[in-house]
């Protein structure tokens, strides 16, 4: 599982920082999570192929989280994209994007599907045989969701030496991967435990964008591999966090501690601060495994 940070700063884009956008690589998927202004430039800068992006998840309709979406959709069209594109986000996102396309007399060359969200309860919004995506209801000034991405590691690892020893044909490999026992030609039943190893522990990533401190999310994100949690302010500006419905680094760390997550990834820093290491310092007072997002960084778990 890899997380590429395209942008992780709050509010306005600058020449040296970008608003929120990330690429999550998980189980052969490449998900784009939020799409602040300048996202497509960052995708090019970091050599991420546009064609690999088939699902885009938008947390809320504040500009620093979705103003890059119409530009990206338009560029896909100009490049002759044919692959379907799925966009998940708050109700209203479809109207906003289609209006801009209509005013420009533009139409996509590919199927564009909008999955608009309205529920204030956690819900599964995407699932296949490898990955499940669930919403994390957040509390901000507008309707906002975070997203929980979970691997499905059902396949067991083949014990090739044992399989070759029993001269088992390849046609049965898939059965072994999914826990099946094998009956040999002489009638012997070989238990799956002899032919395979336990699957890798499934990894998970919780993306929590703009939100006030909210312990209600803890059951949803419990024990995740990585929690990305916004940390717009330091404790010295906690009054601003409350006023604007954002979170401090310490508050994010407390959520991580209570949820018993493995790693905490901080981001969405206010540009008033010149040194983001201050966020780690404050968070470390409560939680040990703290990572700092920054534009262009990649994390692998």
Please report, for each region that a protein language model flagged, where it lies by residue.
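Metal-dependent catalytic neighborhoods of phosphoester/phosphodiester hydrolases
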Residues: 69-75, 100, 274-282
């Amino acid at each position: 599982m890899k997380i590429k940070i395209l942008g992780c700063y709050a509010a306005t884009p600058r020449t040296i920082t970008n608003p929120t956008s990330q690429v999550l690589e998980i189980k052969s998927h490449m998900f784009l999570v939020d799409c602040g202004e300048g996202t497509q430039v960052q995708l090019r800068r970091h050599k991420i192929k546009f064609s690999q992006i088939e699902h885009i998840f938008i947390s809320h309709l504040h500009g620093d989280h979705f103003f890059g979406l119409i530009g990206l959709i338009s560029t896909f069209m100009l490049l002759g994209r044919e692959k379907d594109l799925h966009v998940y986000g708050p109700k209203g996102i479809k109207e906003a994007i289609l209006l801009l396309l209509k005013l420009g007399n533009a139409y996509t060359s590919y199927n564009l599907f909008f999955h608009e969200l309205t529920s204030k309860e956690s819900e599964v919004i995407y699932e296949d045989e490898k990955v499940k995506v669930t919403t994390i209801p957040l509390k901000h000034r507008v309707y906002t969701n975070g997203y929980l991405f979970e691997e499905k590691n059902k396949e067991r690892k083949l014990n090739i030496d044992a399989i070759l020893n029993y001269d088992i044909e390849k046609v049965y490999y898939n059965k072994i991967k999914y826990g099946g026992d094998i009956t040999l030609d002489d009638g012997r039943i070989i238990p799956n435990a002899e032919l395979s190893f336990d699957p890798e522990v499934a990894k998970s990533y919780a993306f929590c964008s703009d939100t006030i401190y909210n312990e209600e999310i803890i059951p949803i994100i419990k024990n995740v591999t990585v929690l990305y949690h916004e940390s717009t302010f330091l404790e010295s500006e906690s009054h601003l966090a409350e006023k604007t419905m954002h979170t401090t680094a310490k508050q994010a760390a407390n959520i991580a501690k209570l949820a018993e997550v493995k790693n905490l990834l901080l981001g969405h820093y206010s540009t008033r601060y010149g040194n983001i290491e201050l966020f780690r310092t404050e968070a470390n007072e409560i939680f040990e495994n703290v990572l700092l997002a920054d534009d262009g960084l990649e994390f692998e778990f």
